[in-house]
């Protein structure tokens, strides 16, 4: 069904507009939905079991193409071709053209154009089912069904070959034999004509008499409809009520080769109760095509009360007049049956349709035996029939419609008897009513079956014909008087013996004889069919063929001949002047005899005219056979001969039987000549018969011969002579009248030709105008198609633009969401980095606190160490002083003992012992390591950046070693080697060592800063930490250095005193003091350290040049004493005492000079140290300021980042709130909320808007709402109640009939219909959604299960309603999140 529901935008829209053009009613019937329209349409049931929708497909005037790729109706299903078939609608008549594809109607396959009838089921392809609905036709059919009658049965009931079909309530067995159809091999046109002719000839044969004696089926108002449900037939009352033509017609299929599609129209049927429905002529049934009759039909005058009949009704009435049983027996058993069938076959040829009329046969009714009684026996003649009105209700379809000619008042009978011409007119319609016209059946197959069954029957013997005198047991109106008169009359006896009367066969060449039945007794009407049927082919005398009839006072012969009657006669007419009434009156008898004589003359004239007609038929058939030259060319002359023999069969049955078998082989001319000779002989016999019949009739009614009567006989003979004279005059008069009739016929022919010319001109104009109308219609259709295509293109472009806009909008939203995600990720990263920095700052502060505490501890330790070192130094100085004094004493004693001889050289031994006592300390290496460890970072310092080694006195090695050990213990930083350091190798008495005074020295701050800045690989925090540590270390060393300087000053003063004491001692020793003896220790006297300054100048200067930062130790010039021995001679020999005083003075001066230099150097060093401290302090301040600035920048950056993050989050929240489809308010749950004040505060003019009634709790007003089940727009009264917390809507403002309720908890969103979704056309099952009445005023209320579309009466009302409803949208819970 998906494919079916894709009914494609183009055709779907067209179908919708087509359906919308006509009135389409949607009616709710309880749970169901009824769709009704007035135009013919198809109801599509889908293409299979999976299809669920029902589609209405309208069938407009013209052609509608159906297929899988058709432009009109596109269907998808198995077996459907692109253009499967098409349906043509011509003024309400719809015809299906299969186009060679698989199509079935009610299960029967269709191969040729077929007319569609109301309610039929179409199957296209394999499983695409469609039901055809024709509302106008259905309405008309309903009007024709009588009250209480059942609905029509299923149409298209197939007729099986070997079964009995119920037709008109009678069982008619069908034989399976099918006549051979002549298939010519030459041209297609000739073969088709011959085939149609053969089928029509085969179909002319009457029913086989196998159903004799069967009782009719149960009567019902409607018979089974074998003709597509179009013929509504009433069953006959008796077996005589069935007509042969109607039985063929009713069992015919929907379309025969010679019938137009419109020929299967329905016909009204009278119910048994006699109720007459309204006018039953539908407007949609067109006239028959001209294959049966010419279009020119003069208007027919009717008596008062006569109603016009459609051609179908007239034709139907023609079928319903059955022949008599005598005719049945005669046509069935005599060779005339075959002749009649062949003649009738010839009349059905479409080639002769406009020229050769159908043969109408007048037959008299004769009683037959029970063996020959047919189901078509009819009531007796209206002249002998008592007034029984019962058959009126059940016989024939048209009995109630046209008034019977016998309903005329008796006055009309008197008028008719005034003149022979009037009698002639009256007779015309008496016989015209008795004329049996045969309708060609529309089913050739049934006709052929009947023909074959007829040919198999043996001919009727004369004895059987004579036995037909007994009355019929099955007569509907048995009349003893009729039976007696039939038995007493000699002429019926002779006619029954011969099989037929002279008037039995009246072949009327009138194509409209079966179609237009003239119920009114006017000559114009009886001539009308003939004028319309001939084109000048026949002689003018043809028109008298239907004038055989009876005047109001008829002879018994004619009365018996008219006993077949017309079934349309509902009531009988009372007989006037019958033979029984005038048997006692001689004048009446003479008048009666005169009338009989005139009748016989008239009948002879009729026979002559019938012969002329037969000759015309023969000529036409011979001409047709010569023109065709087909297979039937040899058979057609025998048709004419057999037809002529049919006229003689009544008088000479044996001769007719004998001649019928052998005459077919004779030549046409010989057979025709013999026929005319036999007919002339039969005329003479007939005249003699009439005379004897009159005489016997007079003899029957004479009571007893008397003398009186003999005189009367003479008078009667005289009178008879007069009457004969009158008869001659009347004959002349009759001839004149015939001439007048011929002239009038010629005039009528001329009139007909003129009218035909005018009609052709009018038809040409009509066709021209019709073509113009068709062209305009095509232009209109093309214009509509173009407009529709343009509209579709615009809609497609709009849809494309809409999709493009939606894609761009979606991409924009994607970009925004991506940017928001990136911002969010960046903000999170910044927040994480900020948190890490804050944690790092906290850790740094903790480490700084730890380092501060460590620095404090180091300072305390340094103070303690300095105090301990000062104590040790004082103790060592006291020991040194004691040892020196001891040494001096020893030297004096040695001098005194040895007589001035010096001590032996023991300097090297002493130094070796000192080396053994003190561990060798690489002071230079320790100094370099200490300075490198105090540097900033792992980068190697250059040799120029590290301070040089300093010379020191050997006596201070132990102290320096201890200070080094303490420094290693208290230093928190690892010491690393800074590379190879320059070392100076001094003399054996001195070594390059670091003095304690150098502890206060450090590299310049510039080099420290440069080194710090050069270490880019260190993190900032580590560099700052190291800088802090370096600063604190420098401060600690500065304090330490100041303490050491003070200590050195004190020691300088003490050394000055000691030097003065030593100089005094040396002076004393030089001036005669005894030398000291050597101590027990064996140590030689220690050489003064000032001698070290008298080393070679080059070495001293080289060391000074190599070490620019090095200076002399403060102890180097603290002694004022002079050394006793210089160089390697340390003894104070007496030889040198003379020059010692001069040298001592020079040394003292030099020492003072050196002391001054040392003081100057000391001051310079102090100033430089102060400058360094100041620079270091400034650098620290700058670093502190820079760090504070960086921290402030970091704090401001983090604050700004925090503000940015908060701002972004706020922006997103704001955008999210703005993206809500709600208006600017959220649902308000407060109980004391004033709705009117709230709406007025929003800027709405409530008082000026007349469409809304607003109070503090309730809002009321009209809105147009789209329905849920049926998508149509209805005006509803809406009530928004905050007390009940509902939005309900009613039919009107009385609020009595509630249509629906929307609870506040279900309302999710209220928004303007900006997408115009309510204005788009869509399909909901098979109902169409019409677009919004005003899309600009449409808004939507979304609930959990449905979306309501509402249209406000004005823009202000729409805004008020949206703001009102949104205060109750409690289903919108997103804002709570």
UniProtKB/Swiss-Prot annotation:
In this UniProt entry, the residues modified to Phosphoserine are: 51, 192, 220, 223, 324, 334, 381, 404, 430, 443, 461, 470, 489, 501, 518, 520, 533, 539, 551, 555, 563, 578, 583, 678, 971, 1017
Q: Gene Ontology cellular component?
A: basal cortex
Q: Positions modified as Asymmetric dimethylarginine? A: 131
Q: Cross-referenced InterPro entries, in alphabetical order? A: FHA_dom, PH-like_dom_sf, PH-like_domain, PH_domain, PHLDB1/2/3_PH, SMAD_FHA_dom_sf
- Where Phosphothreonine occurs, the residues are 522
Which stretches of sequence are listed as region Disordered? 150-187, 211-334, 370-535, 653-707, 936-1019, 1119-1138
Residue(s) carrying Omega-N-methylarginine? 512
The record places domain PH at 1256-1370
* BP terms from Gene Ontology: basement membrane organization; regulation of microtubule cytoskeleton organization
One Pfam family matching this protein:
PH
Domain FHA residue range list:
64-125
Source taxon at top rank: Eukaryota
Please state what the annotation says regarding this protein's domains.
Answer: The PH domain mediates the binding to phosphoinositides.
- Protein name, as recorded: Pleckstrin homology-like domain family B member 1
User: What gene name does this entry carry?
Assistant: PHLDB1
């Amino acid at each position: 069904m998906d494919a079916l529901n894709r009914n494609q935008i183009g055709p779907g829209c067209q179908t919708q507009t087509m359906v919308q053009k006509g009135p389409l009613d949607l009616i709710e019937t309880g749970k169901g939905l009824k769709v009704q329209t007035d135009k013919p349409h198809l109801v599509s049931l889908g293409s299979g079991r999976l299809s669920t929708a029902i589609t209405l497909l309208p069938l407009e005037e013209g052609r509608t193409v159906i297929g899988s790729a058709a432009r009109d109706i596109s269907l998808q299903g198995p077996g459907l071709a692109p253009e499967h078939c098409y349906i043509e609608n011509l003024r309400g008549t719809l015809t299906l053209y299969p186009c060679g594809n698989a199509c079935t109607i009610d299960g029967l396959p269709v191969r040729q154009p077929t007319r569609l009838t109301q309610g039929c089921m179409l199957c296209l392809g394999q499983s695409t089912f469609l039901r055809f609905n024709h509302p106008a036709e259905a309405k008309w059919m309903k009007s024709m069904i009588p009250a209480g009658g059942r609905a029509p049965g299923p149409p298209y009931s197939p007729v099986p070959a070997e079964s009995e079909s119920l037709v008109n309530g009678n069982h008619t067995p069908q034989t399976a034999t099918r006549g051979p159809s002549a298939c010519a091999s030459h041209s297609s046109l000739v073969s088709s004509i011959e085939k149609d002719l053969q089928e029509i000839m085969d179909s002319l044969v009457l029913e086989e008499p196998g159903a004799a004696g069967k009782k009719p089926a149960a009567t019902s108002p409607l018979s089974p409809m074998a003709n597509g449900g179009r013929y509504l037939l009433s069953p006959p009352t008796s077996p005589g009520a069935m007509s042969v033509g109607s039985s063929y017609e009713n069992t015919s299929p929907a379309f025969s080769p010679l019938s137009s599609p419109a020929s299967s129209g329905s016909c009204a049927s009278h119910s048994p109760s006699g109720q007459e429905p309204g006018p039953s002529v539908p407007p949609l049934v067109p006239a028959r095509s001209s294959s049966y009759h010419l279009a020119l039909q003069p208007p027919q005058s009717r008596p008062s009360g006569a109603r016009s009949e459609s051609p179908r009704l007239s034709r139907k009435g023609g079928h319903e007049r059955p022949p008599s049983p005598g005719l049945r027996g005669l046509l069935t058993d005599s060779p005339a049956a075959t002749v009649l069938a062949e003649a009738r076959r010839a009349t059905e040829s479409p080639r002769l349709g406009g020229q050769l009329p159908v043969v109408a046969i007048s037959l008299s009714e004769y009683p037959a035996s029970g063996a020959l009684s047919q189901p078509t026996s009819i009531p007796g003649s209206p002249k002998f029939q008592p007034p029984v009105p019962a058959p009126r209700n059940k016989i024939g379809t048209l009995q109630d419609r046209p008034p019977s000619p016998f309903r005329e008042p008796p006055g009309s009978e008197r008028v008719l008897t005034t003149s022979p011409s009037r009698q002639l007119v009256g007779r015309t319609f008496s016989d015209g009513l008795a004329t049996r016209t045969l309708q060609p059946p529309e089913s050739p197959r049934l006709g052929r079956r009947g023909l074959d069954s007829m040919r198999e029957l043996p001919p009727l013997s004369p004895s059987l014909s004579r036995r037909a005198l007994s009355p019929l047991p099955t007569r509907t109106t048995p009349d003893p008087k009729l039976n007696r008169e039939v038995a007493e009359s000699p002429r019926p006896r002779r006619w029954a013996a011969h099989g037929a009367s002279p008037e039995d066969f009246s072949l009327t060449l009138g194509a409209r004889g079966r179609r237009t039945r003239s119920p009114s007794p006017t000559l114009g009407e009886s001539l009308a069919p003939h004028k319309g049927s001939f084109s000048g082919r026949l002689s003018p005398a043809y028109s008298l063929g239907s004038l055989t009839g009876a005047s109001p006072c008829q002879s018994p012969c004619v009365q018996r001949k008219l006993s077949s009657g017309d079934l349309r006669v509902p009531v009988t007419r009372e007989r006037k002047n019958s033979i029984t009434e005038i048997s006692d009156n001689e004048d009446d008898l003479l008048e009666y005899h005169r009338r009989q004589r005139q009748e016989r003359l008239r009948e002879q004239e009729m026979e002559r005219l019938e012969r002329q007609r037969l000759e015309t038929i023969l000529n036409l058939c011979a001409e047709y056979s010569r023109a065709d030259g087909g297979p039937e060319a040899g058979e057609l002359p025998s048709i004419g001969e057999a037809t002529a023999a049919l006229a003689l069969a009544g008088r000479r049955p044996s001769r007719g039987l004998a001649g019928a078998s052998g005459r077919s082989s004779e030549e046409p001319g010989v057979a025709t000549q013999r026929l005319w000779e036999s007919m002339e002989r039969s005329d003479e016999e007939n005249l003699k018969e009439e005379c004897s019949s009159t005489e016997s009739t007079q003899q029957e009614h004479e009571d007893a011969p008397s003398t009186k009567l003999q005189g009367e006989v003479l008078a009667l003979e005289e009178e008879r002579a007069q009457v004969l004279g009158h008869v001659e005059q009347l004959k002349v008069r009759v001839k004149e009248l015939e001439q007048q009739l011929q002239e009038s016929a010629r005039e009528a022919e001329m009139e007909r030709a003129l009218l035909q010319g005018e009609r052709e001109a009018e038809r040409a104009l009509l066709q021209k105008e019709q073509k113009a109308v068709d062209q305009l219609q095509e232009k209109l259709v093309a214009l509509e198609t173009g407009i529709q295509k343009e509209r579709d293109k615009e809609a497609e472009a709009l849809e494309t633009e809409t999709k493009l806009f939606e894609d761009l909008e979606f991409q924009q939203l994607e970009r925004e969401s991506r940017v928001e995600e990136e911002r969010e990720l960046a903000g999170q990263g910044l927040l994480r980095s900020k948190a890490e920095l804050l944690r790092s700052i906290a850790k740094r502060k903790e480490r700084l606190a730890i380092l501060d505490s460590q620095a404090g501890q180091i300072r305390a330790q340094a103070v303690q160490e300095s105090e301990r070192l000062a104590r040790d130094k004082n103790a060592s100085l006291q020991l040194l002083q004691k040892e020196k004094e001891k040494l001096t004493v020893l030297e004096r004693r040695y001098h005194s003992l040895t007589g001035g001889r010096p001590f032996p050289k023991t300097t090297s031994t002493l130094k070796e012992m000192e080396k053994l006592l003190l561990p060798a300390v690489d002071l230079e290496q320790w100094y370099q390591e200490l300075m490198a460890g105090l540097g900033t970072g792992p980068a190697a310092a250059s040799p120029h950046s590290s301070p040089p080694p300093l010379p020191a006195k050997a006596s201070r090695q132990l102290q320096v070693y201890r200070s080094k050990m303490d420094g290693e213990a208290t230093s928190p930083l690892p010491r690393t080697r800074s590379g190879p350091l320059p070392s100076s190798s001094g003399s054996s008495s001195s070594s390059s060592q670091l003095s304690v005074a150098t502890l206060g020295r450090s590299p310049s701050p510039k080099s420290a800063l440069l080194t710090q800045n050069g270490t880019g690989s260190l993190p900032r925090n580590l560099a700052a930490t190291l800088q802090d540590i370096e600063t604190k270390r420098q401060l600690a060393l500065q304090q330490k250095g100041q303490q050491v300087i003070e200590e050195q000053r004190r020691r300088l003063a003490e050394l000055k005193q000691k030097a003065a004491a030593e100089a005094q001692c040396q002076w004393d020793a030089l001036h005669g003091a005894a030398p000291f003896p050597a101590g027990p220790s064996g140590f030689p006297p220690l050489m003064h350290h000032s001698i070290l300054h008298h080393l070679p100048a080059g070495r001293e200067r080289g060391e000074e040049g190599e070490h620019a930062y090095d200076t002399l130790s403060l102890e180097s010039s603290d002694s004022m004493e002079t050394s006793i021995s210089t160089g390697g001679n340390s003894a104070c020999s007496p030889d040198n005492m003379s020059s010692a005083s001069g040298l001592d003075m020079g040394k003292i001066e030099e020492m003072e000079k050196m002391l001054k230099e040392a003081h100057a150097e000391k001051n310079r060093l102090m100033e430089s140290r102060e400058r360094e401290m100041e620079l270091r302090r400034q650098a620290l301040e700058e670093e502190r300021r820079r760090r504070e600035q960086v921290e402030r920048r970091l704090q401001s950056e983090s604050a700004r980042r925090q503000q940015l993050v908060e701002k972004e989050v706020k922006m997103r929240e704001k955008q999210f709130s703005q993206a809500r489809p709600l208006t600017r308010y959220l649902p308000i749950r407060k109980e004391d909320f004033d709705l009117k004040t709230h709406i007025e505060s929003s800027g709405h003019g409530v008082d000026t808007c007349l469409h809304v009634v607003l109070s503090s709790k309730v809002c009321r007003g009209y809105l147009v709402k789209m329905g849920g089940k049926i998508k149509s727009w209805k005006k509803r009264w809406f009530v928004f109640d905050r007390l009940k917390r509902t939005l309900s809507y009613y039919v009107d403002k009385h609020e009595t009939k509630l249509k629906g309720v929307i609870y506040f908890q279900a309302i999710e969103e209220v928004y303007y219909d900006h997408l115009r979704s309510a204005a788009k056309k869509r399909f909901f099952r098979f109902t169409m959604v019409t677009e919004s009445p005003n899309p600009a005023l449409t808004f939507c209320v979304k609930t959990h299960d449905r979306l309501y579309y509402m249209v406000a009466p004005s823009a202000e009302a729409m805004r008020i309603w949206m703001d009102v409803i949104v205060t109750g949208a409690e289903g919108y819970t997103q804002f709570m999140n």
